[in-house]
């Protein structure tokens, strides 16, 4: 909530945000809904796909993560390490799903806009 308040007041605010989780993104959407700046509508995307993300305005675009599989692998690796195995870093790739809703819009470039890396 406070981050978007700060960024929205910049002379050239970011056009998009990726939030670590849906709760943070919902806070950003809440700020934008309550804001007096009717012309600032950045794209917002996050990770989790919690139920509440379907009921925001606009509905939140999110990445659905395989939470059960992530938990199973974490427990398996932890158990192996406790038993003396898995001493090296473990790299695992899991399938995720992008749930496209209404919080992301097409980007239209303008002249002289700065690049942001947040």
What are these model-derived regions, one by one?
Residues 1, 5-117:
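Flexible loop/turn connectors
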């Amino acid at each position: 909530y406070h981050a978007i308040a700060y960024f929205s007041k910049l002379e050239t605010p970011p056009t998009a945000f990726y939030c670590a989780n849906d709760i943070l993104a919902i806070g950003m959407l809440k700020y934008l809904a309550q804001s007096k700046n009717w012309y600032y509508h950045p794209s917002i995307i996050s990770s989790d796909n919690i139920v509440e993300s379907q009921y925001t305005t606009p509905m939140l675009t999110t990445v659905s993560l395989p939470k059960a599989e992530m938990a199973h692998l974490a427990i398996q690796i932890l158990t192996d390490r406790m038993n003396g195995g898995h001493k090296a870093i473990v790299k695992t790739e899991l399938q995720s799903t992008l749930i496209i809703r209404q919080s992301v819009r097409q980007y239209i470039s303008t002249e002289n806009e700065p690049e942001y890396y947040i």
